[in-house]
Structures are given as C-alpha cells and as structure tokens.
From Swiss-Prot:
Gene name as annotated: ATG26
Family: Belongs to the glycosyltransferase 28 family.
The protein's name in its UniProt record: Sterol 3-beta-glucosyltransferase
Pfam families, per the entry: EryCIII-like_C, Glyco_transf_28, GRAM, PH
Domain PH: residue ranges: 246-343
Provenance organism: Vanderwaltozyma polyspora (strain ATCC 22028 / DSM 70294 / BCRC 21397 / CBS 2163 / NBRC 10782 / NRRL Y-8283 / UCD 57-17) (Kluyveromyces polysporus)
Keywords, in A-Z order: Cytoplasm, Glycosyltransferase, Lipid biosynthesis, Lipid metabolism, Membrane, Repeat, Steroid biosynthesis, Steroid metabolism, Sterol biosynthesis, Sterol metabolism, Transferase
Length: 1217
C-alpha cells in the first residue's frame, strides 16, 4: 500500500511518466528494454516531499518528441547540425562510471528471465529516515565471526585537541625576540601579558605571580582566557574577538511560514546578519536579512521533548523566525553558531572581560574530570559586603594544567576558613542535581548575552565591583557541568529573575566600588570608560516593518522628479556649496540602518530615486555609502532589496534609457553579472556616476585585495571549522555549548588535534581520478595526519613519489575498456562475456578493497562513489565515511546527472529524476554481489538503497563554485570545496624542442593553441587527425597537439595506414602538466574532463570542449553557460575552425576567462576540503552509530525465489488506482 493523499490521477500519470523515463534511460544504454522490464509493479514513496515534488510534476515522455543520439545525450528530433562528426566515439559510454553502469545493467540481465523480477527491482526509492523496509534477511550460512574479522575496534583512536599559543611577531611583545628560540618567545609573551594584567587590574608590585594557565570561563558561551594566580589574588582576563565579515556558517534552511509553507533558502551567517537568498549565486538580492541586534533568544524547538528536533527559533523584538534544518545535528550547529555570534554582537564594544577576587575570599573549590584529559573546576568565593553572598565561577581546562590550578587553589582554602565562613558554608551547602526535572525546578542561571547588563563603570581605572552582580545572582545555585546542555531551556527563570532584581544606579556603583573585594571589568582600547549602551529599545518594532518605507502610487510621480540628496554629515565628502547637500535627520538614518543592517563604519553619502531593471522595472531608492550600494523598492506589494559591495563593481557604462528611465547606467560586477538602473534626468545620472567613482577610488585604495564573491556565501575560515569540530567532540560528552576563542594581542590561538587520524582514500579509474587525492593527502599530511591512497597498481609510483603511502587493489577498469574495444557492437556474445567478466571484476574489487582497508586500521575513509565498496566497509569498521567526486552525484533539481545531460535544459523535475534513475540502475547491477559480500565477508546484513541512505553521506565536490555553484537543495553536509590542484609545474622540465616551438610562435606573432582529447576511441582516428590538421592550417595558428586518440585506432583495417604528415606549425607532444602549459597558450581544445577544465579556468585560458562521454557533456555545457568557452557538438574542419577563431577573437570570452582566473586563484580547495572534514566529522560519525542502531531493529524477510535480490517493498500498480 501507499501512504498517499495525492490525487489518484496525478499518481497514475506520474507512474506512467516514471516508467517511460526508466525505459528511456535504458535506451540510452542501448539495452533492449523488453528484456529487462517485464513486470507491472513499482516502488516509491509519495510521502517524501523531496522525492514526490519533482516526480508529481513529471509528465509522460511525449511520443516522437525526443530521441537518443549516439553521443549519449538527449536530442530533439528537429535539431540539426551541419557536417559530419569525425570525433564521434566508437563506443558511446567510455567514462569509468559509464562503463560500470553499463556493465551493471548487463549483469542485471541474468535476472531478467526470472518471472518474479519486476520494475521495482530497478527503481527503489529512498524512504524517510523513520521508515523501515522489510526484505531479505541474513543468509543461513553467515558466520558472525566474520563481522570484523582481523579488525580490532579498540584500535580506532579518539581525538582531543591541543590549543597552541603562537606568540605574535609584534614590537610591543619583544623587540629582540628570536624567532628560532621558541622557549624565549614563550617566556617573553607571558611576561608581557602579565604586565598588561598588572596594569589592567591595578595589581601592586608586591604581588608575585604563582601560576599562569589557559582556562575557559563557563557562561552562555565558553570564553577562552588567561588565569593568573598571585599570592593574594585570582585573576581571569579574556580578549573578546571582534566581528568580521567572514562567513561563519552557511547552508540550506527552510523558513516556516503560514502563507508560503516552508520555503527553502540558502542562509548565510556573518557579522551581525543572517541573510536568506533564493540561490547561492544570487548574493546581491537577499530575500530576508535578520539583524541579530534585535534577536533576544535562540533555542531549539521542544528540545526537552524531542532530542532530535530539526527546528530552531530566533526570537526577535517583534517577530519570531522558525527554521527547519536538514538534520538535528545541523540544527544544533546553527544554534551554537548563532548564540556565539549573538554574544559577540552584544559585546562588540568591549575588548576584554576581566574578573579579579582575593584569594582570601575563596571558600571551596570542586574538580570534575571529563574525556580523560580535561577538568572542570568550580571556584566558590564570598563577598563580605553583601551578607557573605556566594559567588561561583566555573573554569574548564582542556589539558593537565587543571590539576596544577586545582592544587594551588586548594592549598589556600584551609587558611581562608574561619568560624563565620564555616557556618556560612554549612548553611549554604552545594546542591548536586541529578535529574533534568529537579534541575529545571531549582536552577537559576546568569545569562552572559550582554556584559553591559551586569556591569557598570566609574571614573577610576579600578572601576567595577561584583556588588553590582549580587542583586542578580544572589540566589544562583551551583551549576554542574553535566547540566550545561539544559542552559538554553532555563531562560524563563532568567527573565523572571532579572525582572525582580533591583536596578542600581551609577551613583550606587561609585559608592560601593571602594569597599569591593571582587572586580569584574570590561575594557575597551578606544575608551577607558565603559558605557551602558542599549540600542535594542530604539529599534524595537522596526524589524520586518519595511512597509514603512513604501510609497503610495500618488507620490511616485512627484518623487520621480526629485533631485539627488547628498548627506551633509558624510565626513566632508561634499562641498558646502553643493546644491544637493541636505541634512538627513536621525530618524531617517536609523531606518536606513535598520533596513540594511549597516555596519557602524558605514557612512551614507547620497540618495537617488531610480528604477532597477531586474527582469521588470522596480522603482525605489538607491543609496550610496562608503562601502556598498543599496536599493530598496518603494512600490506596494514589491519587496526587492539589493546589497552590492563597491569592491565587486568592475565598471559602468551609460546606456540608452528605457521607457521607465530615460537615462540608464549599466554596472558590471565581479561575477560578470550586469545591473541596470534608470534615472529621470541626465543630471541625476551624471551625479550618481561622479559619487560612485569617488567611492570606488577610495574603496579600491582601502581594499587592495577584494573579497571573493563565493567567500560571501561559503565559509572558508579554517579556525571556524576546527572550532566546530572541537565543539562537536565535547557535545558528545554533554558539553553542548559554543566555544569562543579569544583574540589576544600577544599570541594567536591555533587548535590542532593531539593525535593524527589515519585517512584512507579509495578511488578507481584514471590518473584524473587519483591526482586530486594526492593534493588533498599532502594537505592532510601537513596537518599531522597519515594518509594512504588505495587504488590500482599502475599509479603506485605516481602516488609514492609525493611521499604518500600506497595500497593496491584489483578492479582495473582497462579490462572493461578492452572488452568494449574487442566487440564492435552490443550483441549476445558481448553480453555473455560482460556478465562473466564483470562478476569476477567486481568480486576482486570488493575483496581486495576490504582487505586493504581492514589491514590499514583506518580512522576515516574518503571514497569516490564509483569505487562502490567504501560505504559498506565503513559500516563494518564503524568509522566515519565521506564521499568525494568531480561530477554531480547528489540528487538536486539544479543539475542533471553528469551521464544523462540533455541538449537543452528540461527543468528541475528532469534533473532530479536523472539522479534517481541512475542510482537505481547502478545499484541494480551490483546489489546481488554486494549483498553476498556483505553477508559472507563483512558479517553485515543485506541492504538496499533505502537503508544505505546515500543522500545523507557527507560529500566533498572537488570542483570550483565558479563552474558548479552549490544548489539551493544541497544539504549542509554537501560541500563544493574548489579544485584540489596538484602543482607539478615546478618539477616539470620541458624539452628544448618544445621551448623553441613556443618561442617561434611568439616571435611570429601567431596564436598558440593546445589540442588534446586524451586516450579516446573513435570510429576513424585518421579522419579525425586530418580534420585537426586542416583546422590548424585554416586558422593560421601554432598548435601543441597531444594525439592520444591515435594510440588505439578504431578499425582494424585502418591501423596500418600511414600517419598523416604534420606541418611545422604543429608540435606533437606526450603528456605535459596542464598547470605549466595552459598559462602559455592562447586557447585550449580538449574533451572536457573535470581536471582539464579546472586547469583552463585556473590559467584563464579560453576553451573549446568537444565532449565524448560521461561528465564531459556536463562540463561542456557549464563552460558555455558561464561564457568562458564553446561546447562543440560535432568535430569537423568547419566547426573546429570556427570555434577556434571565436575563442581567439571574442573579447567577451577572453574577459570572462580572465575574470574566472582571478576567482579560482583566490580559492584554496584543499584547505576548504580539510575544513569541511573537520566540521562534518562528528556528523559522519553519528551516521555510523545511527545506521548500526537501526540495523539492530530491522526484521528481514527472505524471498524464496531469489535469495540474491535486494530487500524491497513491492507495490502493485493496481493498488494505486
């Protein structure tokens, strides 16, 4: 049965369409569909919103509308292209994954004669997490002892972090500091830091330093700081980090809405704003910007009732926002990052936070251990001026220094005790809470959201007393470390407590400061006085009320003729004689700041009324500040905002006005997009140009290295990722609280694992599949980890020459390639041979891969999904598992699967379905052998696509966001990191002939073009070679030719033909490192592989791509879409000559290639990938535990007719009617 509330007709139509598309996909593989699909049943789950939405929008395949051409792409019947194609591949599927897919379909033919086989076996769709499928059970002969044979689970090492303090090279630290003398540097920075503390707190010279430690103060966030013990005082000092424009966190979230349902947005958290976008590539037009200055509370929804909630709430002053994350792990990550950012926002005017109290006031100290290495130390002291009110401060230590700190403080306690204090201690016993209910009933906590709420200032340097705190926290109960996770659920107590607490005046603080014994100080470098600034009341009610700035239609005509407005208070930007200078009142400035979340250092210069042409004209106000351009619509019912950083503007031109704006201007921005504005007069436009140019000149001078566009929507800070990993490690121990690393002027904190991880990289295929892993391995080795690349024997020397360990596995894909070459057509003989050979091929691959991974005792496994075995091995070894690949492999509506690329865009439903079909067909071919291997070798139960949950696996795409922007429906664990480039140019020594050839081309002023298609197999290699030669002669260029296709000619009778003669303008070469060659040529013609395409983008080289198979069609279409080259459908003299001429002469293509070069050069794919591994590692580990837990609760049912079939739920088509 189907749990379904959808209209029956829609389901029937969808089912017919789905079956048509599946049959059509097999037509792509040139397999007789009648031999494979003979049943009338199908499996699906229409309750899955991600799956049902695109499927229910799918229409049946129109008859005679589309056909399959021999290039393995979908093609309209009316599409025509003149000329023959000499580069037509002899065998239509030659990519590695294409070969595996084709072979897997052939293997599936073995079951086609079974009457019980039906379409559901080739179309298993993933179910929701809470859905349990029934299926085949364990084999009767399964040996439980084989579960992890030869593997000791205790060998998996856990990781705790070291926090290193690296002294900063600064004159104020030590002028004569020796860089090589680490001990001297360490002593110098500690000495200078204590001198700063001495002056900061006014510590007398008579006090001597006993101990210096790094501790973390436990409040709503854990604040890293320095603890100093003198002979009379205990001091804590932390330098608060400043807000930056770096992306803290980004990803897909759903915003709960009553009117719109739960729309999905790309959310970016940075500085004081949480911005929501429709698409990661459309970053100038946020749909919603939430100013965190107005946010009062951040919490998980119903966290006590449901520990796995995926919803969290932002409570603002006038509106609440509910977000739905992709998983409970993701929701917790968002909450922690938001809380940390909110803490920084509320205290951004402060540089430091300090606590000082006499040693004599300490009456008790408690110590708890956690994770075998850390300590939580709670210090209790009293304030004699407030009836001996108790104070408690909890400090966390992530190293053994906690023992030393505890011993020193404990030694002071006996001397501090007297009868009065003893009686006080006995009357105020420590309460140890062991249950959540008791905890929630008794505990009241002090929120550390805003330090301004708990401190006050005086005129003197020693200005603040803990007496200020006593009215708030007098009844605070001791906080046990194990209850930290419930802090966020106790805010109601905090609010009640703050309402009933007495408010002290500045005068009261001044009277009591002289008798204080405890100090809590905040200090700003810019002002020695502290101020009680609370602007939240001023902005209350303004958030979300953008309609106040919307004008009625009757006012638009009059305002349209308004002259520009120049802000008089804009730092003398305009002359006083300027006729447009006007004073803008504070109320208007406050509204503008509220609308756009302006930074404190932004100054409004000018205001214009203009039209923004964004598909349709939008009338509104255009604001110019010293940092950005802002636009806000003024038409009722239209909500359009634009935020454009000035450094992104590359130029502007005057254009002919439209009907809506008689005088237009076109802005060209960094990502090659164009924004058009219309003004009512030439004067207004000229004034805007003058103001904009002045702002650009100032901005370009101040910002020498403009921020990368993609860095505004993708987190790239390594410390953020490491800190998230750090937080997740402690979250598993119950310390579910954000960590705040201090920004100390005397040293830089660096977080590194104390133990190295043992990584395994599993991949099969060609050199292009192995090379990116070498680059990533070298980056991880620099981090202190060990890496082993597990692949074919032929890459052993290539891997080991870079100092990386190598492990050999079977499964050489050249055996399948030779099988395809031997058979000129798909016939019965080929199917029989493929079936027998592929079974042995995949068996050897699975067995040798398991032996390699088991013997290596891996901690983390990263696999190219084409290797097939990694996901099962990680389950057997119970280790975190990542996937990494160079082509689209994740279900999305944004891109089709790389092996099912249509000639024209067919929409999100088609794109999504291509991934679903590919997954099912690929799994169909290998499921029987994989399940047999799981049972007999790994000791695991049989599985299917639903239970594998491949869409939940963390995925690293080693592709640049320039060519592959993250899709809006990508989950947080799917990362587009950038290319993993391996720099080989330094070690390459070109031949003298090659250097002479390049020099000759330059002296003659000829264009130099690279042409190479790799080792492809074509019908007539001789004709293709002649076409290339004739194209070179016709275009009058010099060509460096990598003629790999002539190594394996297509037809036997042509193999002994004479090689054509090459003119002097063609230089034949073998393999040359792309990073050395491509910067030296004017254009490149290649097959469109991921690595080759990335090399052309890195070099800024215009490109012509002639795809042959697999992902090459995808990258060809992407290059053409972004305007950096041409995708060639057919290769002959005419088409190739015209394409080469166009990329050499078209200035727009060259300009785009250069622009992309700058963007790719600023990316660091390896570093970003390592950061993603750190940030998603605990999530990957949780999947292993979750899968293991689920498998122990699943009841399997074995089908008697075919024990090798995968588990499935079969739904007859008739039941849908």
């Amino acid at each position: 049965m189907i749990r379904n509330s959808t209209n029956t007709n829609n389901i029937m139509e969808t089912e017919v369409a789905l079956k048509d598309w599946i049959l059509y996909y097999h037509k792509l593989c040139e397999v007789n569909s009648g031999e494979i699909f003979s049943g009338n049943e199908i499996i699906t789950d229409f309750d899955d919103p991600v799956l049902s939405d695109p499927l229910l929008n799918l229409k049946p395949l129109p008859k005679n509308e589309v056909t399959v051409n021999k290039d393995n792409v979908i093609k309209d019947n009316d599409y025509s292209s003149n000329g023959c194609d000499f580069a037509k591949s002899k065998f239509h599927i030659k990519g590695l994954v294409g070969l595996l897919t084709t072979a897997s379909v052939y293997i599936g033919l073995d079951n086609s004669t079974n009457p019980s086989y039906d379409i559901s076996q080739a179309c298993e769709f993933d179910l929701e997490d809470n859905t349990v499928q029934q299926g085949t059970g364990r084999s009767a002969n399964m040996n439980p002892a084989c579960k992890v044979a030869g593997f000791n689970k205790s060998s998996v090492r856990d990781t705790i972090f070291n926090i290193f303090k690296i002294p900063k090279k600064d004159e104020k630290i030590s002028n004569d500091m020796e860089v090589n003398n680490t001990l001297s540097r360490d002593l110098d920075y500690k000495k200078d830091l204590f001198e700063f503390v001495r002056k900061y707190f006014g510590i007398s010279e008579e006090e001597t330093l006993i101990g210096h430690y790094t501790g973390w103060l436990l409040q709503e966030v854990l604040i890293q700081g320095n603890l100093f013990i003198t002979n009379s005082s205990l001091v804590y000092l932390a330098h608060l980090p400043k807000l930056t424009d770096a992306v803290v966190l980004c990803g897909k979230l759903k915003l709960r809405s009553r009117l719109k349902g739960n729309p999905r947005y790309w959310c970016v958290l940075k500085h004081s704003t949480l911005a929501l976008y429709n698409d990661p590539s459309d970053i100038y037009f946020p749909i919603l910007s939430i100013d965190l200055n107005h946010v009062e509370e951040i919490s998980l929804e119903n966290s006590l009732k449901d520990e796995n909630t995926m919803t969290f709430v932002l409570e603002a002053s006038s509106k609440n926002y509910k977000f739905i994350a992709g998983s409970s792990h993701s929701a917790k990550t968002w909450v922690k990052c938001l809380k940390k950012q909110l803490f920084s926002i509320k205290n951004q005017s402060k540089d430091t936070i300090g606590i000082k109290f006499p040693i004599s006031s300490i009456i008790d100290v408690e110590c708890q251990s956690y994770m075998n290495q850390g300590q939580s130390i709670k210090v209790k002291c009293f304030d004699g001026n407030k009836n001996y009110a108790l104070k408690e401060y909890t400090f966390l230590f992530f190293d053994k220094d906690g023992d030393s700190f505890y011993n020193i403080i404990s030694n002071f306690i006996p001397r501090n005790m007297n009868p009065v204090e003893a009686s006080l201690q006995n009357s105020n016993p420590t309460i140890h809470l062991n249950s959540k209910s008791h905890f929630n009933d008794k505990i009241k906590i002090l929120s550390a959201v805003n330090i301004d709420d708990i401190i006050c200032d005086t005129d003197s340097f020693e200005m603040t007393s803990s007496d200020i705190l006593s009215d708030i926290d007098e009844n605070i109960q001791p906080l046990s470390l194990k209850h930290v996770r419930d802090i966020s659920n106790c805010k109601n107590y905090l609010k009640e407590d703050l309402k009933t607490s007495n408010k002290m005046t500045i005068q009261d603080c001044n009277k009591k400061v002289q008798t204080s014994e405890i100090q809590l100080i905040t200090y700003s470098k810019h002002d020695s006085r502290m101020e009680l600034n609370d602007d939240s009341k001023y902005y209350q009610g303004n958030i979300g009320n953008d309609n106040k700035g919307i004008l009625s239609f009757k006012n638009i005509c009059s305002i349209w003729n308004t002259s520009p407005i120049h802000n008089k208070d804009s730092d003398n930007f305009f002359m006083t004689s300027d006729p447009f200078v006007t004073s803008i009142n504070d109320t208007t400035l406050a509204k503008i700041k509220d609308w756009f979340n302006l930074h404190d250092n932004e100054v409004l210069h000018a205001l214009y009324y203009a039209y923004l042409i964004k598909g349709y004209p939008v009338y509104g106000k255009l604001y110019v500040t010293n940092r950005r351009l802002y636009f806000k619509s003024c038409i009722p019912g239209v909500n359009v905002k634009m935020v454009l950083p000035l450094e992104d503007i590359e130029g502007y031109n005057e254009i002919l006005g439209t009907n809506y704006g008689n005088f237009g201007i076109l802005l060209t921005v960094q990502n090659e997009k164009e924004l058009q504005f219309g003004f009512n007069s030439c004067t207004n436009r000229s004034d805007f140009e003058n103001v904009l140019q002045r702002c650009l000149d100032i901005c370009k001078y101040a910002i020498k290295t403009p921020e990368l566009v993609t860095s505004r929507v993708i987190e790239s800070e390594s410390e953020h990722s490491r800190l998230r990993f750090f937080e997740e490690k402690f979250s598993t121990e119950g310390i579910d609280i954000p960590f705040l690393v201090e920004d100390n002027p005397y040293f830089k904190t660096k977080i590194m694992p104390t133990k190295s991880y043992n990584f395994g990289f599993l991949t099969i295929g060609s050199r292009g599949d192995v090379q990116p892993y070498i680059a990533l391995a070298k980056g991880l080795i620099q981090e202190g980890h060990s890496v082993t690349i597990i692949t074919h024997r032929e890459f052993k020397s290539f891997v080991e020459c870079h100092g990386i360990d190598f492990k050999e596995i079977a499964g050489d894909p050249t055996k399948l390639m030779s099988l395809m070459v031997e058979h000129e057509a798909i016939n019965v003989g080929m199917l029989m041979e493929a079936s027998s050979k592929f079974r042995g091929w995949i068996h050897d691959l699975l067995v040798t891969t398991w032996e390699a991974c088991k013997n290596l005792k891996l901690d983390i496994l990263i696999e190219s999904p084409s290797a097939m075995a990694g996901i099962h091995i990680s389950e057997a070894l119970q280790i975190p598992y990542f996937r990494a690949f160079t082509m689209p492999w994740t279900r999305t509506r944004a891109y089709p699967h790389a092996f099912i690329v249509p000639d024209q865009k067919r929409g999100g439903s088609f794109n999504y379905l291509t991934h679903v079909i590919f997954e099912n067909v690929f799994w169909r071919g290998i499921c029987s052998q994989v399940n047999k291997w799981r049972v007999q070798t790994l000791g695991l139960e049989k599985t299917n696509l639903a239970q594998l949950q491949q869409n939940k696996i963390p995925f690293l795409y080693n592709i640049s966001p320039v060519i592959f922007p993250p899709a809006i429906d990508f989950d947080e664990w799917i990362k587009v990191t950038g290319y993993w480039f391996l720099d080989e140019s330094e070690s390459f020594e070109p031949s003298q002939e090659l250097e002479t050839f390049i020099s000759k081309a330059r002296k003659l002023g000829k264009k130099l073009v690279y042409i190479g298609f790799g080792s492809i197999v074509v019908n007539n290699a001789k004709e293709m070679t002649r076409a290339v030669i004739d194209s070179v002669l016709e275009t009058d260029i010099f060509c460096i030719l990598n003629k790999g296709w002539s190594e394996r000619l297509g037809k036997e009778e042509l193999r002994y033909e004479e090689e054509p003669e090459y003119p002097e303008t063609i230089f034949l070469c073998d393999s040359i490192p792309h990073d050395w060659l491509f910067p030296k040529v004017d254009a490149a013609v290649h097959h469109g592989g991921s690595g080759t395409t990335g090399a052309t983008l890195k070099a800024g080289t215009p490109v012509v791509i002639k795809p042959f198979f697999g992902d090459q069609f995808f990258f060809a279409s992407r290059i053409e879409d972004i305007g950096a080259g041409i995708a060639l459908k057919k290769l002959n003299v005419s088409s190739l000559s015209n394409a080469i001429k166009k990329v050499l002469t078209d200035k727009s293509i060259k300009r785009k290639a250069v622009s992309l070069k700058k963007r790719v050069a600023k990316e660091n794919g390896v570093t970003t990938a390592i950061n993603c591994i750190y940030s998603e590692l605990e999530y990957a580990r949780s999947l292993v535990v979750k899968k293991n837990h689920k498998s122990s609760n699943i009841e399997f049912i074995q089908h008697p007719n075919n024990v090798n079939d995968t588990t499935k739920t079969v739904i007859p088509l008739t039941s849908m009617v």
